[in-house]
Amino acid sequence: MSKSLNIIWQYLRAFVLIYACLYAGIFIASLLPITIPGSIIGMLILFVLLALQILPAKWVNPGCYVLIRYMALLFVPIGVGVMQYFDLLRAQFGPVVVSCAISTLVVFLVVSWSSHIVHGERKVLGQKGSKK
């Protein structure tokens, strides 16, 4: 009985912490003058708490494991909702594809540029002029 209560406590604690960060993000988003999704702010709060080791990762790990395990199932309602607007998407197929391609290219460029800034130039082992 004690082991099952411990497992229930771990899952309950994980989901309470994840949802606390989510609702804190929603609350902060409602106070901001610009529109930022509360879920994004909540994720950033959770990230900061984990990165600064204020919140031990083992406390949220069981809940994260469950959410990641069933992530595909969570996208089913979104897919059904998109299919309701299939005619509209078909009419706007060109602009949607172009915007997706451009945004993907912009993301690639920003990530490569920021990676270059953060990591600098590092010599590859075996490259001419590098030390072994």
Curated annotation (Swiss-Prot):
Tell me yes or no: is Cell inner membrane among this UniProt entry's keywords. Answer: yes
What's its membrane topology?
Answer: Multi-pass membrane protein
A cellular component term (GO) from this record?
A: plasma membrane
- Quote the subcellular location field of this record: Cell inner membrane
The SS bond pairs are: none
Q: What keywords are assigned to this protein?
A: Cell inner membrane, Cell membrane, Membrane, Transmembrane, Transmembrane helix
* InterPro entries for the chain: LrgA/CidA (IPR005538), Uncharacterised_UPF0299 (IPR022957)
UniProt keyword Hydrolase present: no
Task: Specify the superkingdom.
Answer: Bacteria
For this protein, the parts annotated as crossing the membrane are 7-27, 31-51, 63-83, 93-113
What NCBIfam families is this protein classified in? PRK01821.1
| Family stated for the protein in its record | Belongs to the UPF0299 family.
PANTHER family named in the record: HOLIN-LIKE PROTEIN CIDA-RELATED (PTHR33931), UPF0299 MEMBRANE PROTEIN YOHJ (PTHR33931:SF5)
Protein name in the entry: UPF0299 membrane protein CKO_00648
